[in-house]
């Protein structure tokens, strides 16, 4: 199979879909890999690194899409890429379709086979290709939240951990999954007072056992969230319904309950956001203010630490990439039910129910 690795063109997206180690694995199995020039530069990989393991370098993104049977990326294609995607071409990347109707329609029209990292799901409901980036995003959510609490960044001027004699910042984390757990670990390590919420009591019991003593757990309900808002300094939104739009846990009306310059970090923005007032931002312009509340809603948070996040992501995706290349997408998905759940749009049909439901489109079960 011919595999193409284009350079990411989303704003400040510095990751790359495949490392030289991944290329070497595919070349060893007699596949051909084309990498766009400088695609890996911001993750620490030179063109020479790719050439040394057997990749061929192409100068332009158009060249990569034109020649490849399968495209391996990090983030969803953006508008300039839509016309480059061919009928029957496999595109293996994060898509987050439920948050973007135009993207969904474009991929339907393209006739491509769109396999979304974020909906590959194992029998135990774990999300093996979302987990590594959720770990990075959770840790970074606390890191950026702490920065935007600083006065020069528009925040309250509070230090997360305080100092002796001065109370630390209070952090509310909505969602106790991978993102929330990692955010809580970071916030606790910085010395903040942390409250983490979830609707799953079994999960809350687990978190109570494994997280530090300065992290408390709370059942997630509208009433409980409202009770916390007047006293918090930082809110991290990390709720997830796989493949579906995130629910709005904080409405615009609820912003009035918070003190001015409270910081909201919406990690769920990829799936539409869990705050009513959220809209996607970029690393170059990461925040905006609504009713006195600072919002951070960068849609590719891990892109700011490309070395760490590229390595973590490709460690997880490579076995699936190899299976797709060696077997073809139909056989690979037939052999692996987890991978089959990644099929979101296939040759003009919406094959993931949550995506179809969000947009009122026809859902068609894929036959393998």
Report each predicted region and the residues it spans.
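Short glycine-/small-residue-rich Rossmann-like dinucleotide-binding loops
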Residues: 69, 75-76, 95-96, 221, ...
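Glycine-rich phosphate/diphosphate-binding loop of Rossmann-like nucleotide-binding domains
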Residues: 6-45, 152-240, 287
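Rossmann-like adenosine-cofactor binding region
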Residues: 209-291
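Glycine/serine-rich phosphate-binding loop and adjoining beta1-alpha1 elements at the start
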Residues: 2, 8, 77-169, 298-300
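Adenosine-phosphate binding glycine-rich loop
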Residues: 118-144, 148-159, 269, 274-368
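An N-terminal-biased, well-structured beta-alpha scaffold segment characteristic
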Residues: 2-110
């Amino acid at each position: 199979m011919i595999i193409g690795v284009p350079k990411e063109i989303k704003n400040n997206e510095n990751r790359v879909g495949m490392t030289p180690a991944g290329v070497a694995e595919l070349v060893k199995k007699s596949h051909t890999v084309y990498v766009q020039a400088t695609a890996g530069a911001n993750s620490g990989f030179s063109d020479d690194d790719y050439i040394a393991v057997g990749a061929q370098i192409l100068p332009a993104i158009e060249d990569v899409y034109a020649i490849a049977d399968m495209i391996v990326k990090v983030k969803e294609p953006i508008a300039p890429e839509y016309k480059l995607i061919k009928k029957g071409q496999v595109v293996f990347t994060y898509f987050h379709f439920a948050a973007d109707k135009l993207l969904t329609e474009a991929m339907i029209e393209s006739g491509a086979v769109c396999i979304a990292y974020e909906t590959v799901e194992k029998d135990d409901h774990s999300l093996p290709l979302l987990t590594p980036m959720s770990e990075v995003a959770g840790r970074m959510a606390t890191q950026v939240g702490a920065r935007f609490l600083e006065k020069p960044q528009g925040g309250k001027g509070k230090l997360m951990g305080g100092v002796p004699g001065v109370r630390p910042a209070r952090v509310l984390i909505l969602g106790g999954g991978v993102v929330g757990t990692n955010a809580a670990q970071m916030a606790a390590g910085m010395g903040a007072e942390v409250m983490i919420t979830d609707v799953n009591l079994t999960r809350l019991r687990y978190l109570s056992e494994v997280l530090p003593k300065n992290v408390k757990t709370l059942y997630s309900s509208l009433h409980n969230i409202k009770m916390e808002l007047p006293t918090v300094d930082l809110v991290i939104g990390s709720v997830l319904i796989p493949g579906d739009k995130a629910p709005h846990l904080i409405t615009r009306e609820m912003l009035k309950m918070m003190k001015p310059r409270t910081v909201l970090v919406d990690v769920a923005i990829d799936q539409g956001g869990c705050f009513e007032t959220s809209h996607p931002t970029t690393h170059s312009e990461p925040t905006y203010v609504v009713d006195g509340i600072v919002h951070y809603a960068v849609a590719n948070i891990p892109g700011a630490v490309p070395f760490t996040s590229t390595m973590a992501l490709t460690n997880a995706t490579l076995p699936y990439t190899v299976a797709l290349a060696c077997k073809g997408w139909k056989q690979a998905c037939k052999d692996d039910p987890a991978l089959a759940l990644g099929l979101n749009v296939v040759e003009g049909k919406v094959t993931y129910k949550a995506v179809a439901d969000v947009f009122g489109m026809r859902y068609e079960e894929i036959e393998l």
